């Protein structure tokens, strides 16, 4: 879940102070290890001192994990509130990570990165195909030739099956009740998210939207942006995705020349 340009200006401003509590059970360390495994399979291993770009970094949890491993990390996110949380965490941990408030569909960074990552279905928040194409092109321009982009998406099936409809367990610091509705014509899932903070009895509602993209569309957009080859994996495995996959990871290698 994260922070890329959609029709809503900052869907994460309200939840930013509680985001880490909401994601407390997410095994970020295991995610970082899985990403490292995929990068190794692509022939671009993540070493100490690798320059890594964390797209839609949110509160910076993944970026900080890679910084702990010795990487030179830059994290970008559209949400000012999330970036402020990331900067606060980095300062508390004494981590040297550059966090920037930038739009995935409109950023320009020098071609100095070995790897770029974009996790937790952040790219599904790009509701217009042209914005996803621009995000891929911008990322390609920020990568060295042979660098890799590793990202995950919610599959068409995941949004069609309305898997966002869920509640979390009792006794948590942030309670939520989410109801999703998928429109097959627009291919957009609208998720009404009701939150309750028991410690303060604060209650609020936010609306998130995600768009589904087919494997063929993603591969076409990546090719146009200058990525080849492209590999796909069932989430958290190193086997190909299947018809019942809910989340797919892509590993796209930057070709020798940037697309125009």
Question: What are these model-predicted stretches?
Answer:
Residues 215-260:
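C-terminal lobe and adjacent flexible extensions of AdoMet/dcAdoMet transferase-like proteins
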Residues 119-121:
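Residues lining the SAM
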Residues 53, 60-106:
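Class I SAM-dependent methyltransferase SAM/SAH-binding core
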Residues 108-115:
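A short acidic, Gly/Pro-enriched loop at the edge of an enzyme's catalytic core
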Residues 1-56:
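Conserved class I S-adenosyl-L-methionine
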